[in-house]
């Protein structure tokens, strides 16, 4: 049990986007992408940068790009690409039903570490009137369009002029091109 003086570690939040397709994906890479819920090309997930998740991202380094997402971009992704179970769009009315005032409030709470995850687990029991620590029934991935203006190369890393691998805060520019 943690003492009252100990702080909970707040890991950075990363957006991870799959850029390479399904054919010729090795089995171990496909399994890791499946664990990250990146089952299709141009699908994005937002993850907490814990050591175990970072190990999975390093393993699929040649299939994805990732970087630190900011609250404004996350709010825009939730507004435009957020889906709830039944493939219905995530709306402001739905958020208000669960006690959230805006997309920006949810995004800021997630980025700051106030809430641990955006999407609740399947067995989450929501109570009316209480604000949950996540968005009930939100799908844990976002389907994006191919980027406007295209990609440089899905065979080279970002550091050498391609698109794969770590790109830091510049991931926000790519996400905005893909909305």
From Swiss-Prot:
It comes from the Archaea. Pfam families: Ribosomal_L30. Keywords: Ribonucleoprotein, Ribosomal protein. Gene3D superfamilies: 1.10.15.30, Ribosomal protein L30, ferredoxin-like fold domain (3.30.1390.20). One of its GO terms (molecular function) is structural constituent of ribosome. GO terms for cellular component: cytosolic large ribosomal subunit. InterPro entries: Ribo_uL30_ferredoxin-like_sf, Ribosomal_uL30, Ribosomal_uL30_arc, Ribosomal_uL30_euk_arc, Ribosomal_uL30_ferredoxin-like. GO terms for biological process: maturation of LSU-rRNA from tricistronic rRNA transcript (SSU-rRNA, 5.8S rRNA, LSU-rRNA); translation. Coiled coil: none annotated. Part of the 50S ribosomal subunit. Belongs to the universal ribosomal protein uL30 family. This is Large ribosomal subunit protein uL30. It comes from Pyrobaculum calidifontis (strain DSM 21063 / JCM 11548 / VA1).
């Amino acid at each position: 049990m943690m003492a009252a003086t100990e702080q909970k570690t707040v890991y950075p939040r990363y957006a991870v986007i799959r850029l390479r397709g399904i054919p010729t994906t090795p089995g171990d890479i496909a399994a890791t992408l499946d664990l990250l819920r990146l089952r299709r090309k141009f699908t994005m997930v937002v993850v907490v940068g814990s050591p175990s998740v970072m190990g999975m991202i390093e393993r699929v380094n040649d299939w994805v790009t990732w970087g630190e997402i900011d609250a404004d971009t996350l709010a825009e992704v939730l507004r435009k690409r957020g889906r709830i179970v039944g493939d219905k769009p995530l709306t402001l009315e739905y958020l208000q039903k669960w006690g959230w005032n805006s997309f920006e409030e949810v995004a800021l709470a997630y980025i700051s570490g106030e809430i641990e995850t955006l999407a609740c687990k399947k067995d989450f029991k929501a109570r009316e009137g209480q604000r949950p620590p996540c968005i009930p029934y939100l799908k844990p991935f976002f389907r994006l369009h191919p980027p406007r203006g295209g990609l440089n190369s899905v065979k080279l890393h970002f550091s050498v002029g391609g698109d794969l691998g770590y790109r830091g805060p510049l991931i926000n520019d790519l996400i905005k091109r893909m909305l």
